[in-house]
Structures are given as C-alpha cells and as structure tokens.
Amino acid sequence: MKNVTDSFISLSSAEGFGLNTNILETNIINLSVVLGVLIYFGKGVLSNLLDNRKQKISSTIQSSEELCKGAANQLEQARARLREVERRVREIRVNGYSQIQQEKNDLINVASINLKQLENLKNETIHLEQERVIELVQKQISYQAVQRALGTLNSRLNSELHLRTIEHNIDLLLAMKNITD
C-alpha cells in the first residue's frame, strides 16, 4: 500500500505525465497483474480470432477444391465436345463436296420458295390495300354526292314542290299496296 501512496505522491510532485521506460523502477507486481489480465482475457479473444481465421481458411480451401473439381468437369466436357466436333469435321470431309453442294442447293430452293411466298404475300397485301383505298374513296365520293344532292334539293325545294313530292310518293305507296293486295 505504501508503494501506491508513494506513486500518488510522486505523481503530484512530478512535472507532467510520462511513461517510465526503466523496467527496474516500475512496479513488477503491477506489470505482472496487467500482463496476467491481458493473457487471461486476450487468450480467449486471440483463440476466437484464430479459430475464425482457421474456419475461413478451411472454407476457402474447400470452396477452391470444389471450384477446381467443377473446372475439371467442365474441362472434360469441353474436351468431349471438341472430340465430337473433330469427329464431325472428319465425317464432313469424308462425305465431301457433294453433301455440301446438296445442302447448298436445298438452302437455295428453300430461300427461293420463301422469296416467292413473300412476293405473293406482298402482292396480296398491296392488292388488299388498293381495294381498301378504292372502297374508302368510293364511300367518300358517295357521301359527298349525297350531301350535294341534299344541298341541291334543299335549296330548290319550296313548300309547294315539297308537298307535291310527298303526295306523289304517297300515291306511289298506295299503288304498290293495291298491287300487292
């Protein structure tokens, strides 16, 4: 206890706070307590850190091994595809030019048929569009003609002519009724 009070006394008489680097002047008991506490609590923390690091390393190694196996499988599959392609290349070379020429002719024939179908479809579409436009123009012309006729009739009809037209139409309807009876 005397050492503790001496240290407080020496602190108050000291000119400032400083670190005593002389190991012989420091209190060995205090240092051993601090080191003991650090070792006791630090051991668990350090152990946890090392365990976590060990788990991360082992999981990384395991995933790397799995990736390596996957890459090896993919490499084997790629080699198998390469062998198949090489076999097909040899087969095509054996069959030779005649097969290629036949396929070329078939493609040309199919393209020609498709072209004719597209041409027919284009012509049919143009024809239908022309008919639609003609029908639309006819409707517009008919509508305009009816509007002009109505305008002409309305401008020329007076009440007397209007009454005569109505009477004439009534007479026509009566005559048609008599014929059907």
UniProtKB/Swiss-Prot annotation:
Keywords attached to this entry: ATP synthesis, CF(0), Chloroplast, Hydrogen ion transport, Ion transport, Membrane, Plastid, Thylakoid, Transmembrane, Transmembrane helix, Transport
Primary localization: plastid
Disulfide bonds: none
Statement: the UniProt record of this protein carries the keyword Thylakoid: yes
Top-level taxon of the source organism: Eukaryota
Additional record remark: In plastids the F-type ATPase is also known as CF(1)CF(0).
Family: Belongs to the ATPase B chain family.
Record function comment: F(1)F(0) ATP synthase produces ATP from ADP in the presence of a proton or sodium gradient. F-type ATPases consist of two structural domains, F(1) containing the extramembraneous catalytic core and F(0) containing the membrane proton channel, linked together by a central stalk and a peripheral stalk. During catalysis, ATP synthesis in the catalytic domain of F(1) is coupled via a rotary mechanism of the central stalk subunits to proton translocation. Component of the F(0) channel, it forms part of the peripheral stalk, linking F(1) to F(0).
Listed name of the protein: ATP synthase subunit b, chloroplastic
Organism: Cryptomeria japonica
Gene name, Swiss-Prot/TrEMBL: atpF
